[in-house]
Amino acid sequence: MSQTDVLDLYKQAGAFHEGRFLLASGRQSPYFMQSTTLLQHPRALMELGGLMSQKILDAGLKPDFIVGPAMGGVTLAYEVARQLSETLPDVRAIFAEKDGSGGMKLREAFAVRPGETFVAVEDVLTTGGSLLRAVRAVEGQGGQCIGLCCIIDRRQQTGPLSGYPLMSLKELYFDTYASHEVPGWLAERPLQEI
């Protein structure tokens, strides 16, 4: 599957939107990609999970588990781990969830042994904040992050993720704006909070 095909999957599923959107980062964008609309389809999830697991294998990584930030990364982490488990010994899937104080935490049932390696997965990276909070939650339990993998990398700067190897199925850059930077053509559109 080519990079163009990944974007086509979003469009075909009605998961690529044009308008004016307030992103989780607080920035505004003329585009929004709603991965849950796409990933509710098992065939799309299997295809994307397969591409991501192949990227991980091609990079020579052999994680003990895959972690995704809740909610969007939960099914993705499971599917990537499932497909990696066809090649590697029992790769687990876990998720990190909000802890109520701006960070993330793991459920008690997700035991991480010190030194276990993991890859963190995400659907769309805009700032990387959610993924970084998930990584830090696992590192706080003794896990060692050996890579990051996403479907779409929208970041225009490496930012806080620069210390980790990143793999993506597609890089897609379009401008985002702070509220005081929104150009007139975009300001004319109704703002949709997502």
From Swiss-Prot:
Superkingdom of source: Bacteria
Catalytic activity as recorded in UniProt: orotidine 5'-phosphate + diphosphate = orotate + 5-phospho-alpha-D-ribose 1-diphosphate
Chain residues that bind 5-phospho-alpha-D-ribose 1-diphosphate: 98, 122-130
SUPFAM superfamilies listed in its UniProt record: PRTase-like
Keywords: Glycosyltransferase, Magnesium, Pyrimidine biosynthesis, Transferase
This enzyme's EC code(s): 2.4.2.10
Gene3D superfamilies named in the record: 3.40.50.2020
Residues annotated for orotate binding in this entry: 126, 154
Keyword Transferase set for record: yes
Pathway(s) where this gene product acts: Pyrimidine metabolism; UMP biosynthesis via de novo pathway; UMP from orotate: step 1/2
Entry keyword annotation includes Transferase: yes
Entry GO MF terms: magnesium ion binding; orotate phosphoribosyltransferase activity
UniProt record, GO biological process: 'de novo' UMP biosynthetic process; pyrimidine nucleobase biosynthetic process; UMP biosynthetic process
Cofactor(s), by name: Mg(2+)
Family assignment from sequence similarity: Belongs to the purine/pyrimidine phosphoribosyltransferase family. PyrE subfamily.
Function: Catalyzes the transfer of a ribosyl phosphate group from 5-phosphoribose 1-diphosphate to orotate, leading to the formation of orotidine monophosphate (OMP).
Subunit structure: Homodimer.
NCBIfam families, sorted: pyrE_Therm (TIGR01367)
PANTHER family: OROTATE PHOSPHORIBOSYLTRANSFERASE, URIDINE 5'-MONOPHOSPHATE SYNTHASE
Name recorded for this polypeptide: Orotate phosphoribosyltransferase
